[in-house]
Amino acid sequence: MNSREITTQISKAADFLNLKKWDYGASFSNDYSVQVDKGEAKQLKASQKQILTIRVWNQSNLVGITTTSDISESGIKKALKQANIASDFGNKNESTEFSPLAKDPIKVKEVKKRNPVGIKKLLTVLREAEVKLLESHESIKSVPYNGLSESFFERVYANSDGAFRSYSKSQAVLYL
């Protein structure tokens, strides 16, 4: 499910639950990394993370907040319900409102995002880099600390006033 679909799901669930004012921030990421030692795979890791922080304002304009990693329809409804329950305990001395900048576009330098190459390709590239480094000078006997990783992430903010902001990036890191 992409961030627009999640926003639609939250909006529909909020309407169903009769919640008029809400917002959410989300972070989604996929990370892959490899390490080698003398050409042998030492560590291979892949992870996928998704987290939503949802705020709900009750009819007294008190705010409740909850966090979930369940982005299914039932998970989103449950999170909205929990945030609504939490709003009963909101601070009466503080009134939180949407930022007037929430609908402003995010100015991001456009950079080509890459698709994941995957663990096998990362492992092959790192093995080749280790061999080249070992062969580059006779005094280099081993490369005990090395790694190659790639990360892909998206950050999202949306609210019941129609704001939707999103930022995504991919990056790779090599250390030898």
Which stretches of residues belong to each language-model region?
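Active-site bordering "gate/hinge" segments
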Residues: 1-176
